[in-house]
Structure formats: C-alpha cells, structure tokens
C-alpha cells in the first residue's frame, strides 16, 4: 500500500540553509548523489530535485539570505522562490533538513540584530516548524572551523533561541557535523534513514554500523 500511494504523488526530503552553510556538500556526502559542488558559496541558485527511491525526491534548495555576486533583485527573487516552494509543497514534504554554519552563528546573528533583523537560521527552523507541524532535522555544520569552546557557546545560544529558552526539548533534533573530519555525519545518516523508514520509504542513506 505504501509503495502504491508513494508512486502516485512525489514526496520530498528538503534541504535548506544559507549560501555558506555547506548544504550541497553535505547532501553529496550523505546520499552519494552526483551533485555539482562549486568553489564559492551560493552555487545552488535554483530548486534542484534528485530522485531517491519510488515516489521520494530529494530537494536541494538555493541558499536563503544574502548572495554574493548577484543583484538585490535576483537575490530577492531566489528567496521568494524558496519560501513559495516550501509553502506550496508543505503537505508533500515528509522531512526537512535545515543546515547552518555553527562556527559563525553568534557573529552573524549579532550583526543582523544590530540592523534589526532576526537570524536567518533561527527564522528558517521556526518557519519549517510552522508549516510542517513538526521539528525539522537541524544540522550545525562546520564544527571544525572554530575552537570547541566557541562551537559550544554558539550551539548553546542557537538551542536557546529556537526553543524559547528550553534547549533540552530540541537538543535531540540537532546534529553537529564536520565534512572535513567526518565527525557526526554517520549519526546524521542514521537519523535521516530512521525517520524515512518509519514513514514507509526506502532510502539511499547508509546506516553506520555500531561497533
């Protein structure tokens, strides 16, 4: 029954994140899909779809937020397309993965707040919760870019902000990763695989064997 229903309507595993989050590189590492990875942030500038299994499609969304080397008009158009895709396809998104650069979280957040803006990373997680009715998988990427103490401080602040000061209720949904060292990637694969299987889908995400 699951296979028949899935084949009738595409369902999506959606990856979101700012242009410099390392989103597309993470997708490639997790899934083994042949995704083009650019040398500069913001390479993904359109909605890209990749079939995973019967009825299941991975969606790599463009980076949300400020883009380097493009006009403000183009940047706004891309950002509008991201939000429109998420809102119009919310009922068909079975899993959302929000990726962000944990190494610069506080620095970027404080800079935005001085200008009267909310953190794009926090805003996206809350937005996904609102339209999907469940907490997304959140990936705090690039933990190798700063000292452990800085990463811990950034992560603690992020958890407090997305949970209204109750970090323990969201901690299990947040995974720390480094593509450079591979740390945390196996655990993230396990989590995505388990969630998709629980919803009746076959996945290409390899489960890390326990020692």
PLM feature spans:
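Canonical P-loop GTPase G-domain recognition
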Residues: 134, 144-207
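Conserved C-terminal guanine-recognition region of P-loop GTPase G domains, centered on the G4
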Residues: 81-170
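Basic Arg/Gly/Lys-rich low-complexity intrinsically disordered segments
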Residues: 1-15, 194-211
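Conserved G1/Walker A P-loop phosphate-binding module
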Residues: 1-76
């Amino acid at each position: 029954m699951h296979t028949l229903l899935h084949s009738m309507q595409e369902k999506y595993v959606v990856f979101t994140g700012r242009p410099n989050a390392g989103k597309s590189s993470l997708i490639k590492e997790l899934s083994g899909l042949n995704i083009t990875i650019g040398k500069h942030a913001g390479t993904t500038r359109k909605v890209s779809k990749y079939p995973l299994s019967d009825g299941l499609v991975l969606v790599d969304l463009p980076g949300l937020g400020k883009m380097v080397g493009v006009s403000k008009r183009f940047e706004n158009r891309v950002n509008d397309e991201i939000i429109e895709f998420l809102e119009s396809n919310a009922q068909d998104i079975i899993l959302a993965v929000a990726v962000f650069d944990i190494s610069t979280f506080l620095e970027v957040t404080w800079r935005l707040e001085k200008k009267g803006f909310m953190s794009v990373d926090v805003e996206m997680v809350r937005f996904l919760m609102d339209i999907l009715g469940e907490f997304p998988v959140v990936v705090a990427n690039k933990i190798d870019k700063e000292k452990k103490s800085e990463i811990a401080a950034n992560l603690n602040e992020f958890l407090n902000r997305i949970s209204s000061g109750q970090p323990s209720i969201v901690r299990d949904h947040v995974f720390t990763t480094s593509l450079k060292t591979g740390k945390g990637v196996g655990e993230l694969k396990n989590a995505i695989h388990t969630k998709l299987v629980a919803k009746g889908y076959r996945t290409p995400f390899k489960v890390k064997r326990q020692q």
